């Protein structure tokens, strides 16, 4: 909903808009292009798209993004690369979030990383915790380095 966009804007001070997807399970490059007409893109330094849906549908559609980042959370399980290979194959960066909860779940970080890299040897896999901030500096560094390459 537009509530999510407003929440992001309120918490970060960053302009945020909702892309209307007409009830589909994804956004695509055409939807993004139309949404960008609402933005002053001349002064835009970085655009982050949050696709919707699950680990299947969004992986099948090109959003027009330069890089794809996905989040896998520890509670979801280390088997997700086996169940949803395409999402991991098309991701440049895989963030394994909620790393601060590892002791409470049967999640093998190294096994998950191995499974991801088997599907996509070029992927970067980083452990993060949105709650504690662990690993977020590495994420920011990765984003900034990739941005410089454009």
Task: Outline where the language-model segments fall.
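Inter-motif core of Ras-like GTPase G domains
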Residues: 58-76, 83-96
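Generic recognition of short, well-ordered alpha-helical segments
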Residues: 30-31, 63, 82, 86, ...
């Amino acid at each position: 909903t537009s509530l999510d966009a407003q929440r992001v804007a309120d918490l970060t001070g960053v302009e945020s808009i909702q892309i209307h997807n007409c009830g589909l399970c994804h956004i695509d490059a055409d939807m993004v292009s139309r949404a960008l007409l609402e933005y002053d893109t001349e002064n835009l330094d970085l655009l982050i798209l949050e696709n919707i849906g699950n680990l299947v549908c969004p992986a099948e559609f090109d959003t027009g993004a330069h890089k794809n980042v996905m989040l896998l959370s520890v509670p979801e399980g280390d088997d997700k690369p086996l169940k949803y290979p395409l999402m991991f194959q098309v991701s440049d960066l895989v963030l394994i979030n909620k790393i601060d909860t590892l002791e409470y779940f049967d999640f093998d970080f190294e096994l998950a990383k191995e499974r991801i890299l088997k599907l996509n040897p070029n992927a970067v896999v980083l452990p993060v915790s949105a709650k504690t901030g662990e690993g977020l500096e590495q994420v920011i560094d990765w984003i900034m380095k990739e941005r410089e390459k454009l």
